[in-house]
UniProtKB/Swiss-Prot annotation:
<keyword id="KW-0687">Ribonucleoprotein</keyword>
<dbReference type="Pfam" id="PF00471">
    <property type="entry name" value="Ribosomal_L33"/>
</dbReference>
<keyword id="KW-0689">Ribosomal protein</keyword>
<dbReference type="GO" id="GO:1990904">
    <property type="term" value="C:ribonucleoprotein complex"/>
</dbReference>
<dbReference type="GO" id="GO:0006412">
    <property type="term" value="P:translation"/>
</dbReference>
<dbReference type="InterPro" id="IPR038584">
    <property type="entry name" value="Ribosomal_bL33_sf"/>
</dbReference>
<dbReference type="InterPro" id="IPR001705">
    <property type="entry name" value="Ribosomal_bL33"/>
</dbReference>
<dbReference type="GO" id="GO:0005840">
    <property type="term" value="C:ribosome"/>
</dbReference>
<dbReference type="GO" id="GO:0003735">
    <property type="term" value="F:structural constituent of ribosome"/>
</dbReference>
<dbReference type="GO" id="GO:0005737">
    <property type="term" value="C:cytoplasm"/>
</dbReference>
<comment type="similarity">
    <text>Belongs to the bacterial ribosomal protein bL33 family.</text>
</comment>
<dbReference type="InterPro" id="IPR011332">
    <property type="entry name" value="Ribosomal_zn-bd"/>
</dbReference>
<protein>
    <recommendedName>
        <fullName>Large ribosomal subunit protein bL33</fullName>
    </recommendedName>
</protein>
Amino acid sequence: MRVKITLACTECKQRNYNTTKEKKNHPDRMETKKFCKFCKSHTLHKETK
């Protein structure tokens, strides 16, 4: 079952992206490098509740 998650910037703590993930295949919190429009650079984004 796919669940909705929110990705937050680790620099400015803004929640920039909404996406889905397969909980069974990826039980850990997701981390990815994405563009933050508030920081105006590519930063690490982590999954939030």
